[in-house]
Amino acid sequence: MAEPNEDDKPSEIKWREDTVGKLDLLVSLDFRMTATPLYSDIVLPAATWYEKHDLSSTDMHPFIHPFNPAIDPLWESRSDWDIYKTLSKAISEMAKDYLPGTFKDVVTTPLGHDSKQELGSEFGIVKDWSKGEIEGIPGKTMPNFAIVERDYTKIYDKFVTLGPLLEKANVGAHGVSFSVKDEYEELKSMLGTWNDNDKNSVRNHRPRIDTARKVADAILNISSATNGKLSQLSYEDLEHQTGMPLKDISQARASEKISFLNITSQPREVIPTAVFPGSNKNGRRYSPFTTNIERLVPFRTLTGRQSYYIDHEIFQQFGESLPVYKPTLPPMVFGTRDKKVKGGQDALVLRYLTPHGKWNIHSTYQDNERMLTLFRGGPVVWLSNEDAEEHDIKDNDWLEVYNRNGVVTARAVTSHRMPKGTMFMYHAQDKHIETPGSEITDTRGGSHNAPTRIHLKPTQLVGGYAQISYHFNYYGPIGNQRDVYVAVRKMKEVNWLED
């Protein structure tokens, strides 16, 4: 219902009025018919948890678990690894006709966490090389640039092979690295090698990872959390950086190697490693930042200490140099130029939140019959009994929840536990379960994300400044879809759109 913004356009990039066009092909891989497969042109059926080999670990506990197939994947379903392996083989075959030869790509990467690039923004002052304020230096005042050579005919060969960089370069994370050259040689005998007749083959004499089980064993063999020798090497590297004695943390497990066969017989506790600042030495329960406090390993911050103040000009501009309380945005449901809603906007306006689900893990299990029977068996929104009473809403009434972004149709759950002025809808309640049509849009109601929109937080775009530097799944911009308001109305008639 929102109208396009015609006034506030980006000023520093070229705005193109003509777009590429609509999405022509959507392919999804899933073991359940969630909302994404329902919209997809092609659905690749995936194996479930107990139909494939895989690894399971988490920062919630110090153990590593295996997945082993109790049965083969049903019908045409395959494991994730086998699906991508099949796709890579098909693409490589097609590339011989459509993309022969090699191509060069220029790839940009952001200034990296735990690297020299953390020093890119001196004194937290950002100067724009594109405006001539500072010299453009790749990896310092601008992104890194690398030339990557692509050969699409060899995608499959590379996919099923553990590549040669492990022989030459160190591996690791969080500023700690070590050589795995010996482990790479071990994997050749453990997993077998490719021996093609073609002397130009990129995979010749290299370890085979053509099955998910082999991939799992390769990961376990080159990880410092499952290989005691590599754990010792990781602490050795951190000792060199800090001058502090650390190798004793994993000394008792230096000769230990955790294999897939080991964890199949019994899940194993991971080996302490310098990659993480915790310590589970001698069976101690893992706790974060143990080595920082007890062994005086500097925190990975600008000062080497726990930091609350960020001396960076962008954080200062947004008033976030220190952790501060910020009130919510004003309760806007529609813009002045947006389409008018049928019947006019309703008086009940609430903050709209989408917390993690109570009867599902993201979209998984949310349509499971057993889980659905634990509550209302369809989409629900929660609001306070005070708000409900003031607007004649009774528990289990059908509601329309809407704003300029979209509409949700769901049953009301009234509760004294909900704060007045707030509504939430547990996330991942897909619209294919008991979702009626909307009286506002004349189409079926949307999912929990229908009223939300994605915002980028500007301070998360800062980089090249000590701990405020990018690393995948560590620090960087996220999709923030909070801080929105919705109007709420009772539905006059529930239409299931079945005609």
Locate the predicted segments by residue:
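Glycine-rich phosphate-binding loop of nucleotide-binding enzymes
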Residues: 1-38
